[in-house]
Amino acid sequence: MKKLALVVGLAATLFATAAEAMTVQEFLTAAARIPRNPTALLRADTRRLIAEVRTAGETIGNEREAAIAAGRRPAFCPPGGRASVSADALLARLNSIPPARRNISVTQAMREWMAERHPCPAS
């Protein structure tokens, strides 16, 4: 019984850690350790960062769709309804955030970037 409780507790801790949003500083620190070559895609750190960006993109995309469905003005309006981002552009944007603000989540950084990059026309 104690063993089961320990396993459940450990699983809950790991799940809670995974569910926390990564900060921009954490993202940049992890990205700096990844070599810029084809083998980078084989690294677990690379896959973790890709998943973080994918999750952030899905989150802000869902927020945009929810705002439209509710009749509110969305935070950003990309042409064609979708925005694509290259790895270099993303890293450049995250590196441009002042160190004092790098405690924001990657999701928040992307939200702000998309609002700046793809502003919605005034109604």
Question: What are the residue ranges of the model-derived segments?
Answer:
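Sec-dependent N-terminal signal peptides
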Residues: 4-13
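Residue-level marker of intrinsically disordered, low-complexity segments enriched
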Residues: 5-6, 20-22
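N-terminal signal peptide c-region/cleavage motif recognized by signal peptidases
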Residues: 14-18
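Short N-proximal segments of mature Sec-exported proteins
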Residues: 22-92, 113
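Surface-exposed, polar helix/loop patches in the mature regions of secreted/periplasmic/lumenal proteins
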Residues: 80-123
